[in-house]
């Protein structure tokens, strides 16, 4: 229904604008206790010896439901959180592994719009470009009924992909 789609887009725009207002407010607050906590504060990046891990505390939009605001919020958060790792993979072929966790039983993983994650990594210059000479990616979906949906992103040198994937699959199966 077109009305529902327009309504959802409006809600996403409102959410994005509220997040921006909170970000601006927090920028000028002197006392840390007065800062407002919100979803974007829960994005995390951790550097390990051989890879970079990003935690995204929200649902990745589906292709059919994607709009500029959901895409933009995820892209800008990934960019902001990873910019301290600029040039980490300069001139490297990089593999980006995206694990999407939903709390529903049936996930149609090929309908997830992961471009916002890759674009954030390019904008922060963690990876040089998203063309085939610089990166490739894979997406894994799983369901955890008792948890809120989230996404984990692992970035590492492409040559490490096979070993890493084998370890990941073995750990997830146990």
Question: Predicted segment positions?
Answer:
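An N-terminal amphipathic alpha-helical segment
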Residues: 65-95, 103-107
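Short amphipathic
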Residues: 45-60, 97-102
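Residues at beta-strand starts and edge strands
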Residues: 50, 91-96, 147-151
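Short, surface-exposed beta-strand/loop "edge" segments at domain boundaries and coil↔beta transitions
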Residues: 61-65, 104-108, 160-166
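Short glycine/proline-enriched loop/turn "hinge" motifs that connect secondary-structure elements
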Residues: 45-47, 86-91, 145
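N-terminal targeting/trafficking signals and adjacent low-complexity tails
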Residues: 1-35, 42-51
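Short, hydrophobic/π-rich interface segment
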Residues: 100-136, 140-142
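C-terminal edge-of-domain segments
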Residues: 130-174
């Amino acid at each position: 229904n077109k009305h529902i789609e327009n309504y959802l887009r409006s809600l996403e725009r409102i959410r994005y604008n509220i997040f921006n207002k909170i970000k601006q407010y927090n920028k000028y607050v002197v006392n840390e206790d007065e800062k407002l906590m919100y979803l974007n504060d829960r994005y995390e990046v951790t550097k390990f010896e051989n890879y970079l891990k990003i935690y995204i505390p929200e649902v990745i939009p589906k292709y059919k439901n994607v709009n500029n605001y959901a895409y933009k919020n995820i892209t800008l958060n990934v960019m902001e959180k990873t910019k301290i790792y600029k040039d980490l993979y300069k001139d490297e072929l990089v593999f980006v592994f995206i694990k999407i966790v939903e709390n529903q039983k049936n996930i149609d993983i090929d309908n997830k719009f992961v471009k916002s994650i890759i674009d954030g990594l390019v904008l922060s210059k963690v990876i040089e470009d998203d063309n085939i000479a610089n990166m490739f990616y894979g997406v894994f979906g799983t369901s955890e009924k008792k948890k809120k949906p989230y996404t984990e992103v692992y970035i590492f040198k492409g040559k490490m992909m096979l070993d890493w994937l084998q370890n990941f699959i073995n750990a997830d199966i146990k």
